[in-house]
Amino acid sequence: MQKSEILFLIYSSLLLSSSLCQIPVDKLSNVGVIINEGKLLKIAGSYESRYIVLSLVPSIDLEDGCGTTQIIQYKNLLNRLLIPLKDALDLQESLITITNDTTVTNDNPQSRFFGAVIGTIALGVATAAQITAGIALAEAREARKDIALIKDSIIKTHNSVELIQRGIGEQIIALKTLQDFVNNEIRPAIGELRCETTALKLGIKLTQHYSELATAFSSNLGTIGEKSLTLQALSSLYSANITEILSTIKKDKSDIYDIIYTEQVKGTVIDVDLEKYMVTLLVKIPILSEIPGVLIYRASSISYNIEGEEWHVAIPNYIINKASSLGGADVTNCIESRLAYICPRDPTQLIPDNQQKCILGDVSKCPVTKVINNLVPKFAFINGGVVANCIASTCTCGTNRIPVNQDRSRGVTFLTYTNCGLIGINGIELYANKRGRDTTWGNQIIKVGPAVSIRPVDISLNLASATNFLEESKIELMKAKAIISAVGGWHNTESTQIIIIIIVCILIIIICGILYYLYRVRRLLVMINSTHNSPVNTYTLESRMRNPYIGNNSN
C-alpha cells in the first residue's frame, strides 16, 4: 500500500472519529436509536467523456482463402447482434433533431453543443430519455470526424490498441478484438499447419469470442440506452484495463475507487458500422467533488421499555452532520459506496429542533410513539453484538438458552460474545462477533420524550365524503346566489319605486279614514251616554173632571 493511500485512510478514520464524538452513539442506543458509522458526501455534478471504438473483426490476410468461411459465419453472427442496434440508432436519429449554433470568429468556428436545441419530430414534447439521447447524439456528431479517422487507422494497422487525443482534450480508445490472437497465433500457424487446421482453430476462437462478447457486453449491445460498463468487459475481451482509462483523468484515487465500486462508468452505443464491423461507445466518467467536513449517518431505532410501557423513537433514516449543525438527508437519488455517498445534489433536509437535541444526546427531547403492535423492530446489531428489547421480546443466552431478564429501569439490553455468546431473539439464534463490546451508558434515568403519532391514517373515505359534501354545498350555494340575485334586482327599478310610494300613500289615506271613522263613532257614543245620564222633570196630570158618581153620593 502506498504512502498516499495510508494517509488517506488515516485521514478518513480521524474524520469519522471526530464526527462520531459529536453524536453520543452509546447514549442513544439506550433508547433504541442505532447510529452507524458516517460516510463522506461527494457530489457528482458533471462528467468527462471518452470514446471507445470496438473493432470486432480482426485484420487478417489469409492465403488461398484459408479461414474465409469462418470469417463469413462470424460476420453473420455479428449481423444478428448489431443490425437491431443499428436500426434503433437510425430510428433515434430520425426522431431527434439537433440544431447547433456556430459562432464564427477570426479563429476556427466553435460549435457550442451546450446550447443545442433539442426537439422531436414525431413527439410533441421531449422526454428526459429523449433529451439524454439527443445530447449523446450531439456529442457523437461532434466526435464523428475523429472517430472516422481512427476507424481508417484501425483498418490499416495491426495493433490491438490505438489511442488518439482529440483537440478538446478527450481521448478515443480503439480496441481491436482478437488482433493479438491473430498476430501471435494465426499468422505463424498459416505457414506451419494445413489450411483446414488453421481455419478450424480460427473458427473456434471466433465462436468463443462471440460468446464472451454477447455475455460481457449484453447490457451495452442490447440497448441504445445508457448502461454501466463492467471492468470485466474491457479487461478480459479487449486487453485493456479500465483503471488505465480512469488514470488519464486527474482524479483522486478514492474518487476512482468510488466510481468503480458503484459502477458509475456508463457506456452508450452511439454508432454501429456494419461495413467495417465497428461499434463506438460513448463512455461517461463522473467528476466527484467531496464536501469537506460533512458526514452522513444511517440511523434506525428499535422499541424500548420504560415505566412499564413500550415506546419507539421517531428519527430520520439518514442524518447529515455539517460542522456544528445536524439535519436529515434524502439519499433517494444517491449511490452508496464503501466510504461515501455519491449524490447529484446536496441531500440536506431540515429536521425539528427536538430531533436535533435528541440526536445530540438529550433523550428527554426524543419524539416517541407508543408501540401498539409487533411491526416495530425489537433488536438490531451494534458493535459486533446485539441490542434488544428483552421485555417485549424473548431473549436467551448460550447453548442452554438461558432466559434474559431485562431490568425494568433499562430501556434495552446489550448482548455480546462476552456476556452471552449464542444469542436468541424470539426464536432467532445468532452468534455475536468475538470483537464486539458491551455498549452501556451509566445508570441515569431515561425520560420519555414528547409523544407523536407516526402511524399513517387512512382518511381517503372521509376525504371523499367531505369532497362530495362540499360539491353538493357548492351547488346549493349557487342556487341560493341565483335566487338572491333575482330577488335583489326588481326593487332597484324606478317604476317599482313609484308603485311602492303610491301604495304607501293609499295605505296612509286608508289608515287616516279608519282613524276618522273611529273618531266619529266614539263621539256619537259619548253623546248617547251623556243623554241617558241627565235628570228628567215628571209631571202628574190629574183630571179636572170629577167623578159624577162621587159627587152624588156625598149629597
Swiss-Prot record:
Task: Enumerate the SUPFAM superfamilies for this protein.
Answer: Head and neck region of the ectodomain of NDV fusion glycoprotein, Virus ectodomain
The lineage is: Viruses, Riboviria, Orthornavirae, Negarnaviricota, Haploviricotina
**Glycosylated residues?**
N100, N241
Q: Does the keyword Membrane apply?
A: yes
Give the family, as the similarity comment puts it. Answer: Belongs to the paramyxoviruses fusion glycoprotein family.
Q: State the gene name recorded for this protein.
A: F
Assembly behavior: Homotrimer of disulfide-linked F1-F2.
- Gene Ontology biological process terms from the UniProt entry: fusion of virus membrane with host plasma membrane; symbiont entry into host cell
Q: What is its main location?
A: virion
The identity of this protein, by name, is: Fusion glycoprotein F0
Q: Which loops or segments lie on the Extracellular side of the membrane, by the record?
A: 22-496
PTM characteristics: The inactive precursor F0 is glycosylated and proteolytically cleaved into F1 and F2 to be functionally active. The cleavage is mediated by cellular proteases during the transport and maturation of the polypeptide.
Residues of the signal peptide: 1-21
Q: List the record's Gene Ontology CC terms alphabetically.
A: host cell plasma membrane; membrane; viral envelope; virion membrane
* Fusion peptide: region residues: 113-137
Q: Which residues lie on this side of the membrane: Cytoplasmic?
A: 518-555
* Keywords linked to the UniProt accession: Coiled coil, Disulfide bond, Fusion of virus membrane with host cell membrane, Fusion of virus membrane with host membrane, Glycoprotein, Host cell membrane, Host membrane, Membrane, Signal, Transmembrane, Transmembrane helix, Viral envelope protein, Viral penetration into host cytoplasm, Virion, Virus entry into host cell
